[in-house]
Structures are given as structure tokens and as C-alpha cells.
Regions:
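Short, well-structured alpha-helical interface segments that form or flank functional binding sites
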Residues: 3, 21-24, 90-92, 116, ...
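Flexible helix-coil transition and linker loops at the boundaries of alpha-helical arrays
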Residues: 1-2, 31-48, 78-90, 125-131
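Amphipathic alpha-helical repeat scaffolds of TPR domains
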Residues: 2-14, 42-64, 90-104
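Extended alpha-helical scaffolds
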Residues: 1-29, 36-39
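Long, low-complexity regulatory tails in eukaryotic proteins
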Residues: 94, 101-103, 113-167
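Alpha-helix C-terminal capping/termination sites
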Residues: 14-16, 61-66, 103-107, 127, ...
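Alpha-helical repeat scaffolds
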Residues: 18-34, 65-84, 109-123, 149-164
Length: 167
């Protein structure tokens, strides 16, 4: 049932339906295995898929009247990094968390943290040979390095790598 509700939410999101509609499906999905999500997060018994679901809810609510807040995203990201997930599992959630973190780091705060999680995301993607999120992470990393006047050749290499993936 959780998977079905999550898929309904994703379809509604892709169709551009209201955040309210998408959130209704997400709340139903979350309730299937995380009826006490906040408590379960504190006890540390959530799976990667459950964290992805919580991140998706955060993304859907971002910029709406249902916004979950930057604090929740920070806490989710920190929890994900503290977990001892297998590499094959980490690659499913760390890049997503890094991309969402960039949405709240536009003002120049937490640049070091954003750089660290973006580097980790890129490393995980490369180690596992995954392309999902790779172009976005490469773009984000190049932007971060550019902002701090990083190595121009390396930044160009990141952009070329991204272009090669998108071709």
C-alpha cells in the first residue's frame, strides 16, 4: 500500500497537481510504515526508502503553505549521514538530500556543509556507477567550486562530464 500511495504522489507531482493532493498521498504512504515518523526517526529504525519518502514530502511542501522547514531537512540529512547504510543503499538517498539542501543554501550559509554532502553524493554515484542525479550533482558541485573560485580546469572537467552524460 505504501508503494502505491507513493506512486500516486509521484504521478500527481509530475502532472502538476496541487501540493495538497500530492501531500495527501504522501501522508497515506508514510502512515503505512511510519505511523509515528518523528518517534521512529529518533529511534533510528527507518530504511533508505522511508527516508526518500520523507525527503520527497519535504520537497513537495517546499515553498507552499505546508512547508516543512529547513530544520527538518537538516535533521533528515544529518540522520541519513549518520546511518550505517550499505553503499548500494546510500547512493539512493544521499544525492537527493544534497540536491534538496542546495535549495535552502542559496544565501551563502552552510556552503562548507553543502560542499561536503555534494562531494559525498558525487563519490557515491561514481562508486556505484549510477547516473540518476549525476548531471544535477555535477552541476551543483561545479557551481559550488565556482563560487569559491576553485580550480577552473576541474570545474570545466565537471561540466564536460555532465555534458557527456546528457548527450
Amino acid at each position: 500500500q505504501q508503494f502505491i500511495e507513493q506512486e500516486y504522489a509521484q504521478i500527481a507531482w509530475l502532472r502538476g497537481e496541487s501540493a495538497e493532493t500530492v501531500c495527501e498521498h504522501l501522508e497515506k504512504a508514510i502512515a503505512q510504515t511510519m505511523p509515528e515518523a518523528e518517534t521512529q526517526r529518533k529511534t533510528g529504525i527507518l530504511s533508505v526508502e522511508e527516508y526518500k519518502l520523507l525527503l520527497f514530502r519535504w520537497e513537495v511542501c517546499f515553498g507552499t503553505d505546508r512547508e516543512r522547514g529547513e530544520k527538518e531537512l537538516q535533521e533528515l540529512t544529518e540522520e541519513i549521514f549518520q546511518k550505517n547504510f550499505e553503499r548500494t543503499e546510500r547512493v539512493k538517498v544521499i544525492p537527493y538530500a544534497a540536491l534538496l539542501k542546495a535549495k535552502t543554501s542559496q544565501d551563502g550559509k552552510q556552503d562548507t556543509y553543502l560542499k561536503m554532502i555534494t562531494e559525498t553524493a558525487l563519490e557515491n554515484l561514481r562508486e556505484e556507477g549510477k547516473l540518476l542525479y549525476m548531471p544535477e550533482i555535477l552541476k551543483q558541485y561545479a557551481k559550488i567550486l565556482e563560487k569559491e573560485n576553485g580550480d577552473a580546469e576541474f570545474i570545466q572537467l565537471l561540466r564536460q562530464e555532465r555534458a557527456g552524460i546528457l548527450e
